[in-house]
Amino acid sequence: DVYKRQDAYIASTEKNLDINICPYIEANPETEFIIFFPPYSILFWNDVIMENHLDATIEEYRYIAERLNAYANVKVYFFPDQEEIISDLNNYADYSHYHPKFNRYMTECFANGECLVKKEGEEGLGAGKTIDEYLAHMREIAENFDYEELLLRRG
């Protein structure tokens, strides 16, 4: 199954970035772009696990972060591993649309550097973590979360 492959999403993601995002970044070098991965609910990650797409999804996140962080005028932020947000289904209208109050939290992070994905060579400097650190934490959450208990509570 193609979706079980670690690189299953890379070609389509690369094409999407090449067409829809990177040209605008490159055409506007004086503009700072803030790109963020949103905090999809744990139900999104349940689907990823059930469909055996975890490796491909993790690699897609890694590819996007590394590709965009290569630009001097881009800052990338990572919110998917905010367990206290993503594990509370009351924070969501559905599995990807979170409560508007989290927009304020994210903009505060943009200002203070929390949840920043560090660029290559910035390890150990200031706020934020490397994409590998964020993804390792996200993998840990996705693989170890008690989905059955959550779904029983919601039932």
Q: At which residue positions do the language-model features occur?
A:
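Substrate-gating cap/lid alpha-helix
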Residues: 44-77
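Short, small-residue-biased leader/transition segments that mark boundaries at the very start
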Residues: 2-3
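A Trp-anchored, charged/polar loop motif used as the substrate-binding/catalytic surface
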Residues: 9-23
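Histidine-centered active-site loop/cap adjacent to the catalytic His
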Residues: 91-141
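Acidic carboxylate-rich catalytic motifs and surrounding loops in phosphoryl-/glycosyl-chemistry enzymes
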Residues: 72-88
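Active-site segments of SGNH/GDSL-like serine hydrolases
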Residues: 25-51, 78-82
